[in-house]
Design a protein with these regions (language model features):
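Short conserved segment of the HATPase_c
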Residues: 215-229
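Short beta-strand/loop element within the Bergerat-fold HATPase_c
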Residues: 190-202
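A conserved beta-strand-to-alpha-helix junction within the catalytic ATP-binding
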Residues: 16, 110-126, 132-145
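Acidic ATP/Mg2+-coordinating residue in the GHKL
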Residues: 210
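Glycine-rich GHKL/ HATPase_c ATP-binding element in histidine kinases
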Residues: 267-269
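Conserved micro-motifs of the catalytic ATP-binding
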Residues: 103-110, 146-148, 153, 158-167
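Short helix-loop "hinge" at the ATP-lid/N-box region of the Bergerat-fold HATPase_c
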Residues: 183-184
């Protein structure tokens, strides 16, 4: 067994002694290692592809421009705009990749007020929402009309008495920012995004509701996978690499929380970021 063939399994003896148990445990370890290496390999391949795309656009446009005999001023301006857009895309992608690899090194000892955090996200994204023609709102009411099942909060158990959570303010800000930005990007024209902060059974819930086209059931878990995009052409047009929600998922898990799609239909979707609440 070598690094290249970790999928190889040892034959488990037909017995119930320690050797059989040890062999079975060893095979399970190999399977986990093989899965981890495969995931890392796929992630690296996807990252390389995403990095290559803006570089290819830059190279192609520069080569075309180089062949022009006497470029006009408007052509220079178009070239500069393209370079600015593609370098910004590269910078954002590299920054997100670094964030995902450095999560464990960020201290998580801040006492974070979620209402204040959401307010800061709104201030920063207000120009983005205005440019997109999307209205953003904070809903501080104490009741919501949620369907009730094993994954969905019961309105009767919700309240607004959110205290604080302990974690990294920087990372939690990034998680909420990504959720709200995503809801703005993939919304309908003149749509809206509503954010509310609730508490249920010691869990703080940041609910982000949009008026987009919804997310199909088969994609509701996949959207949190790295590099996954429901509509690849639309995501590329908006500069997305499919890492925003994956980073949210990583940050949530790093704070002993979860993120998932609570409900989705043709009228829009609601995503919930759930985090443990502190009592101090």
């Amino acid at each position: 067994i070598q690094a290249q063939n970790l999928s190889t399994q040892l034959e488990v003896p037909n017995s119930k002694d320690e050797i059989a148990q040890l062999t079975s445990s060893f095979n399970e370890m190999l399977a986990r290692l093989d899965n981890a290496f495969s995931t890392q390999k796929q992630f690296s391949a996807n990252a390389a592809h995403e990095l290559r795309t803006p570089l290819a656009v830059l190279q192609t446009n520069l080569e075309v421009f180089e062949k022009k005999q006497e470029p006009e001023m408007v052509e220079y301006q178009q070239l500069f705009t393209m370079i600015k857009e593609q370098t910004a895309r590269l910078s954002q992608l590299v920054g997100t990749l670094l964030d995902m690899t450095n999560l464990k090194s960020v201290p998580r000892t801040d006492h974070v007020s979620l209402e204040e955090l959401v307010d800061e996200v709104f201030c920063d994204l207000d120009p983005v929402a205005e440019k997109a023609g999307i209205s953003i709102h904070f809903d501080d009411s104490s009741s919501q009309d949620w369907h009730t099942d094993v994954h969905t909060p019961d309105a009767s158990a919700l309240n607004n008495n959110i205290r604080n959570i302990t974690g990294s303010y920087v990372l939690l800000y990034r998680a909420v920012y990504n959720l709200v930005e995503n809801a703005i990007k993939y919304n309908r024209p003149n749509g809206s995004v509503t954010v509310s902060v609730k508490e249920k059974n010691g869990q703080a819930m940041i609910l982000v509701k949009d008026t987009g086209i919804g997310i199909s059931p088969e994609n509701q878990k996949k959207i949190f996978d790295p590099f996954f995009r429901v509509d690849k052409s639309r995501s590329r047009a908006m500069g997305g690499a499919g890492l925003g929600l994956a980073l949210v998922d990583s940050i949530a898990k790093d704070h002993r929380g979860t993120v998932n799609v609570l409900e989705s239909s043709e009228a829009g979707s609601t995503i919930a970021l759930m985090l443990p609440v502190d009592n101090f």
